[in-house]
UniProtKB/Swiss-Prot annotation:
Keywords recorded for this protein, A-Z: Cytoplasm, Elongation factor, GTP-binding, Hydrolase, Magnesium, Metal-binding, Nucleotide-binding, Protein biosynthesis
Principal location class: cytoplasm
Record region (G4): 136-139
GO cellular component terms listed in the entry, alphabetical order: cytosol
Classification via InterPro entries: EF-Tu_GTP-bd, EF-Tu_GTPase, EFTu-like_2, EFTU_2, G_TR_CS, P-loop_NTPase, Small_GTP-bd, T_Tr_GTP-bd_dom
HAMAP family the UniProt entry points to: EF_Tu_B
Role this protein plays: GTP hydrolase that promotes the GTP-dependent binding of aminoacyl-tRNA to the A-site of ribosomes during protein biosynthesis.
Protein's recorded name: Elongation factor Tu
Pfam families documented for this protein: GTP_EFTU (PF00009), GTP_EFTU_D2 (PF03144), GTP_EFTU_D3 (PF03143)
Region (G3): 81-84
Stretches for region G2: 60-64
Domain tr-type G: 10-206
Gene (name only): tuf1
């Protein structure tokens, strides 16, 4: 059979495996890639290729992740798997591999374990929108009632963290049996059922270009006779000449009109997501705009000073702090293109945060920044990164 050629026209969805150590995340990843390649075309990867995860840098933090790709009948999936628990924490907080949905792997022999719970909490905090469950190692449990019990526990745990536990697809199977080509109920058919659950339960993500216009401002220029130009990379949506935009963050929100868009010194009618462009603003003075603000479609994003966040604190080995920090610590928070000083408040009962920890905290900034839940930031001290975080909830 000739190799199926890679189709770019299928919708692209990002997923990943989460769950407790040794519950079978990497084996399942290999099984999905292998069985999809066999059934729907594409290239298979074996367990050893996935397990030897290469190091990546995201915001100066070293993370080990493996990426595999596979096709279902209707989609192309990019799947991320991490070898160690710390890699998951870093990956999810930095957004190095954004997930449109996660596959929670839970061994039926163990039931939910500490990292099962922690990964569900992290998914909630960093805004992973959907979770599908694969109950693994079901071939090793001969009591149907025990399987029912474990499934119920997992569903309750999901509900605890505001995921719809009762409606979440739970697939029973054995990643190892599937990988070995087993034709029984827990073999290949369980993995195909999982892929079908991904296809139906995780909605197609909205593309950046279809979202509301947003462009972080990197630079501001004054062009004599033309006015003020702000430059940056369009993060989402499209901006057209003649449209109204808001300048949000740091100062009071201003509304202005786009009188020109240029890219590489050429005039355009519009700037689109992913493009670096200059936007000419009508009647805006050079001193009214600064780096760190954003241009946005009116009414779509608001400036805030207070938020709750999930933060990973770099270890000493990663170039982070050598000592813990306490309540009231005031570092710089780097959002998009600029640093803003903020004070942190730790949760009750937490005295200090050690390098290498991940922690929930509340932050109050000295200037407002345009933000929504899911926005990533770095924590810096004297120009070096000491942490990475994500906005879990805006509070003021």
């Amino acid at each position: 059979m000739a190799k199926a050629k890679f189709e770019r026209n299928k919708p692209h969805v990002n997923v990943g495996t989460i769950g407790h150590v040794d519950h079978g995340k990497t084996t399942l990843t290999a099984a999905i890639a292998t069985i999809c390649a066999k059934t729907y075309g594409g290239e298979a990867k074996d367990y050893s290729q996935i397990d030897s995860a290469p190091e990546e840098k995201a915001r100066g933090i070293t993370i080990n992740t493996s990426h595999v790709e596979y096709d279902s009948p209707i989609r192309h999936y990019a799947h991320v798997d991490c070898p160690g628990h710390a890699d998951y924490v870093k990956n999810m907080i930095t957004g190095a591999a954004q997930m449109d949905g996660a596959i929670l792997v839970c061994a039926a022999t163990d039931g939910p374990m500490p990292q099962t719970r922690e990964h569900i909490l992290l998914s909630r905090q960093v805004g992973v929108p959907y979770i599908v469950v694969f109950l693994n190692k079901c071939d090793l449990v001969d009591d149907e009632e025990l399987l029912e019990l474990v499934e119920m526990e997992v569903r309750e745990l999901l509900s605890t963290y505001d995921f719809p536990g009762d409606d979440t697809p739970v697939i029973r199977g054995s990643a190892l049996k599937a990988l070995e080509g087993d034709a029984g109920q827990y073999g290949e058919s369980s993995v195909l059922a999982l892929v079908e659950a991904l296809d139906t339960y995780i909605p197609e993500p909205e593309r950046a270009i279809d979202k509301a216009f947003l462009m972080p401002i990197e630079d501001v220029f004054s062009i004599s006779g033309r006015g003020t130009v702000v430059t940056g990379r369009v993060e989402a949506g499209i901006v057209k000449v003649g449209e109204s935009v808001e300048i949000v963050g740091i100062r009071d929100t201003q509304t202005t009109t786009v009188t020109g868009v240029e890219m590489f010194r050429k005039l355009l009618d519009e700037g689109r997501a992913g493009e670096n462009c200059g936007v000419l603003l009508r009647g805006t003075k050079r001193e009214d705009v600064q780096r760190g603000q954003v241009l946005a479609k009116p009414g779509t994003i608001k400036p805030h000073t207070k938020f709750d966040a999930e933060v990973y604190v770099l270890s000493k080995e990663e170039g982070g702090r050598h000592t813990p920090f306490l309540n009231g610590y005031r570092p710089q928070f780097y959002f998009r293109t600029t640093d803003v000083t903020g004070a942190i408040q730790l949760k009750e009962g937490v005295e200090m945060v050690m390098p290498g920890d991940n922690v929930e905290m509340s932050v109050e900034l000295i200037h407002p920044i345009a933000m929504d839940p899911g926005l990533r930031f770095a924590i810096r001290e004297g120009g070096r990164t000491v942490g990475a975080g994500v906005v879990a909830k805006v509070t003021a």
